């Protein structure tokens, strides 16, 4: 059975749709707030963290992943104040029961957050973003090992690069190696092959 990770927006009708399809969902992902470093351009009507937390709390239990998947950040993001503000935001989502992990693209930011607040890090899993292009066992192993070297929980699943969709023998071999190394970690594929 296929399971999907889908974006979340705090719309009551959409929340009801997701709740009704919860058995087919691997989780939801969302922008943590208008000032957080994710790979999307800011929208004009980004929901507030309070709106997001309220909407997420109405969903059945499933992974709820906040996006921190920008590869490049403003210098202020990694400053003491920037890390503090980001950790306060993560802690607020945790207190609301609205966050189970983060999708990240910068190992340095992940390590900085882990070092700045081991308490927050231990509550969240760290999921490598798709821009890591996990197209080989060696690359995937290096990225997962790096995530596991922090205080964050290991990723419950990783999304393999879309290029492996075109090589079923290679995909089978890569998946076998990953499952032997991390038997509890799920594997996913990009679905937008066009």
Briefly describe each language-model feature range.
Residues 1-143, 149, 153-194:
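Active-site pocket-lining/capping segments in soluble small-molecule metabolic enzymes
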